[in-house]
Amino acid sequence: MRKIIHIDMDCYFAAVEMRDFPEYRGKPLAVGGSSDRRGVISTCSYEARKFGVRSAMATAYAFKLCPDLILVPGRMQVYKDVSLQIREIFSRYTQLVEPLSLDEAYLDVSECQQYKGSATLIAQAIRRDILAETGLTASAGIAPVKFLAKVASDLNKPNGQYVITPETLPEFVKTLSLRKIPGVGKVTAEKLSSLGLNTCGDVQAYSKPELLARFGKFGGVLIERSQGIDERGISADRERKSVGVETTLAKDIYSLEQCQQVMPGLIQELALRLSRSAKERKIHKQVVKLKFNDFKQTTIEHRSDEVSIVMFYDLLAQAMARQEGRGIRLLGISVGLADSILAVSEIPNAQTQLDLAL
């Protein structure tokens, strides 16, 4: 049986700010963009969360919930540097580390001999090292499988940990909400609920052939996860799946022509990001995303192994057909990256294609 730890830093960006600027401690603090420029909250302190402030919330709305909110701009390089410190700590215990973002990661400690191989004690040691060396707290989840380790890391926050053992796993998953399963979003959850399926226990008792008939391949995944089965390993060499860029607009715009004026800057920035992080990766799709002023969003994608600037504009026009009179507050473009890395001589890479097009 594997021993998986999910480490999740507590309100990471905000915690770094409170560490470096003690005057923010104990106060409602948020890191994000300004309210007069359509900014959003990246993360916030637990004091701010008591007022209902949350990540990805519009900054203007956050101030309505918490008028005394302290808003600071992000210092991304600082957060990256601290994240590297944390990853160095991980490497003392295992090389099987799968970073999910700057502030969370999966670790497989199945072969770790420290602390007599106890994943519980290893997680405690990692959290202790992080606190001693960075001044920041982390929470941890320990389980035999990945998705349950992630669920567990959220159960004793902040600065705590929760263990799901092979013995307690069957009872734990029975009462687990299906919303906790990766891939079950709001729409899928509503479909499942209409069938009387709200917990993993409900799925366990439901007809498997009917689930497969209704949900196809995902039905099979749902059946496995509801039994606590997750065979996915730790991707220590995990490659990014996409590169994108988006902009939140200072004011809502309403016409296709206005959106088209935003595109050249996005395309240039995308080319720059590709040159930095995916120089020789082959693409497999292009995507355009719009977020409307009612905070709903739509995405249009086109599968292709070549970047086409014209296609980005075509996808934009298709997305605008879903506007229904709403204002546009965010516009983004991205490319999906294929798993294989081919030599430049075999196929023009995405960044080169964009340079040629520009």
Curated annotation (Swiss-Prot):
What organism does the record attribute this protein to? Shewanella baltica (strain OS155 / ATCC BAA-1091)
Tell me its EC number(s), please.
Answer: 2.7.7.7
- One biological process GO term for this chain? error-prone translesion synthesis
Transmembrane segments in this chain: where? Answer: none
PANTHER family according to UniProt: DNA POLYMERASE KAPPA, DNA REPAIR POLYMERASE UMUC / TRANSFERASE FAMILY MEMBER
Secretion signal span: none
Task: Please report the stretch or stretches of sequence annotated as the UmuC domain.
Answer: 4-185
Name of this chain's protein? DNA polymerase IV
**Which enzyme type, at the first EC level?**
transferase
Extract the GO molecular function terms from the UniProt entry: damaged DNA binding; DNA-directed DNA polymerase activity; magnesium ion binding
The UniProt gene name for this protein comes to dinB
Catalytic activity annotated for this protein?
A: DNA(n) + a 2'-deoxyribonucleoside 5'-triphosphate = DNA(n+1) + diphosphate
> Which GO cellular component terms are attached?
cytosol
Metal-binding as UniProt keyword: yes
- Active-site positions, per UniProt? 104
